[in-house]
C-alpha cells in the first residue's frame, strides 16, 4: 500500500478526503501526524496554493503528496472570499467567525443575487520536484442562505443551499455530500488520473 501525505492541517478536509480515499489502496497520513507545519499560502489561485502545499509536504517527508486548496466564491462579492475563505475573518478565525462575517457582508444582497460556488483543487505530486503534477478541479453551485441550517460538514456548509437537493450542505449525509461536492468531484477526477498514470 502506497503511503501518501495529505498536505492539510484542516481536520474537516482530512475526514472528508480520508473517507473518499478509503477504498483506493492509498495509506493516507495527515501532514500533522508527520510533524509537518502548514505551508505559507502565497499563491493567488487555488491551483498555486495547492501546488505550494503539496510541494512543501513532499519536500519535508520524502513522500508523494496530495494537497487540497478550496474555498467559496460568492458572485455578488466578485468571487470573494475565494482563496481567503479559511481566513476571511482573520488569520486565526474559526469556521463560525468566517461564516458570521460572510453573512454580515451579504445581509443586504437580494435572494436572486446570492449565487455562490465551492471550488476544490486537488494536486498530486509524486515527489517534491515532480514537473508534471496531477491537478484536478471540482466546483459545486449553490445559493447562500440568510442563516445557518444543519450540523454536518464544516466551514460554510450551513449556509450553502443546494437547490436540487433542497438542503444546505450541512444537512446532507456524508454519502450525499461526497456524491455532489466540489471535493468529491475533484477527488474522482484525481483517482481516474492516478488509475491511468
From Swiss-Prot:
A GO term from the CC aspect: cytosol
Active-site feature positions: 69 (proton acceptor)
Cofactor(s) listed in the protein's UniProt record: Mg(2+)
UniProt cross-references to CDD domains, sorted A to Z: HAM1 (cd00515)
Role played: Pyrophosphatase that catalyzes the hydrolysis of nucleoside triphosphates to their monophosphate derivatives, with a high preference for the non-canonical purine nucleotides XTP (xanthosine triphosphate), dITP (deoxyinosine triphosphate) and ITP. Seems to function as a house-cleaning enzyme that removes non-canonical purine nucleotides from the nucleotide pool, thus preventing their incorporation into DNA/RNA and avoiding chromosomal lesions.
Family membership noted in the UniProt record: Belongs to the HAM1 NTPase family.
Name of this chain's protein: dITP/XTP pyrophosphatase
NCBIfam families reported in the protein's UniProt record: PRK14822.1, RdgB/HAM1 family non-canonical purine NTP pyrophosphatase
HAMAP family: Non_canon_purine_NTPase
GO molecular function, one term: XTP diphosphatase activity
Protein source organism: Pectobacterium atrosepticum (strain SCRI 1043 / ATCC BAA-672)
Presence of keyword RNA-binding: no
